[in-house]
Amino acid sequence: MSDAHGVARDQLRAFIERIERLEEEKKTIADDIKDVYGEAKGMGFDTKILKKVVALRKKDEQERMEEEAILDTYLLALGMIESPPEG
């Protein structure tokens, strides 16, 4: 029975160590992304808009169109636009 516990302990340790390595890689990547946004900002780009563009590019066209239609409906209801844009 003690061998089974030892194996489980070793497996658990291996999982934890893998997760820790991946978390460190994730932090490094997040720092790299932050640096890229900083470079873009330094060249005059609006990073808030860049982040929106990145988020939009992750979505498929149909999903984007549905979200835009809902947004237009809400803006129209709030009087923030006169009529939904054609398109």
From Swiss-Prot:
Molecular function GO terms recorded: DNA binding
Q: Name the InterPro entries for this protein.
A: GapR-like, GapR-like_DNA-bd
Q: What is stated as this protein's family in its record?
A: Belongs to the UPF0335 family.
- What protein name is recorded for this chain? UPF0335 protein RL4065
